[in-house]
Regions:
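N-terminal, positively charged nucleic-acid-binding surface of large information/translation enzymes
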Residues: 2-224
Length: 224
């Protein structure tokens, strides 16, 4: 019986086969066709929880992307139209600290002397560079996601949408003003999220220091 699948050589070159499949997917627009073919079907929407583009991708990013790819593929196989939007987290201390290290800065004062506007531009350029590396890694591992319509947290449109959402919540009386103990970084001169605080955790060994002071009054003072 004839098979529609190509036979594999006994000594298969897996990386070469992967590249052939990836090339076929890209040249034939297989991902886009898988979405278009289910037009009118019930939708299952996936917005990627964006990675922070402050450095080169690591193995933990691959692990997370496996889960982000498996579930949309499963829903696609069930016949749903799966919209998959990529995203890039461009803000936060990780990006700023990476640029500070690149420029040899040691604190907030160096940024102010350098200039807020040019520092922001350096941060944007750094994000753009690392996004390219993330994109290459994502395509190499076969993760299907729409990069053409990706959202960027540093875009004016995205920032305005966040302010709009906050205003809507305020108008509905859902914002509460209260006190909260928040971590603060004296070097960076800014508050920290719980996630950012946990990134700086390390085990250290410090001496225990005991200081004795003479008692000058009370029963302890009477004892000399």
């Amino acid at each position: 019986m004839a098979s529609s699948f190509n036979s594999l050589a006994p000594q298969i070159d897996l990386p070469q086969t992967e590249h052939q499949i990836l090339s076929f997917w890209e040249t034939q627009d297989i991902f886009q066709k898988s979405v278009a073919a289910r037009e009118g079907k019930p939708t299952w929407t996936f917005y990627e929880g964006p990675p922070t583009a402050n450095g080169k991708p690591g193995t933990h990013h691959i692990e997370a992307r496996v889960f982000k790819d498996v579930f949309p593929r499963y829903q696609t196989m069930k016949g749903l139209q799966v919209i998959r939007k990529a995203g890039w987290d461009c803000h936060g201390l990780p990006v700023e600290i990476a640029v500070e290290k690149e420029l040899g800065f040691s604190g907030k004062g160096d940024i102010e002397n350098y200039g807020i506007a040019p520092f922001n531009e350096k941060c944007k350029a750094s994000v753009q560079e690392h996004v390219g590396e993330f994109t290459n890694m994502t395509r190499r591992m076969g993760f299907w996601v729409d990069f053409d319509e990706a959202y960027w947290t540093m875009s004016g449109e995205y920032v305005e949408s966040v302010w709009w959402s906050l205003k809507e919540i305020w108008n509905k009386g859902l914002l509460v003003q209260d006190y909260r103990v928040a971590p603060y970084c004296p070097r960076c001169g800014t508050g920290l999220s719980d996630h950012e605080l946990s990134q700086g955790y390390e085990s250290v060994v410090d001496p225990s220091v005991y200081v004795k002071f003479p008692a000058t009054s009370g029963k302890a003072g009477e004892l000399g």
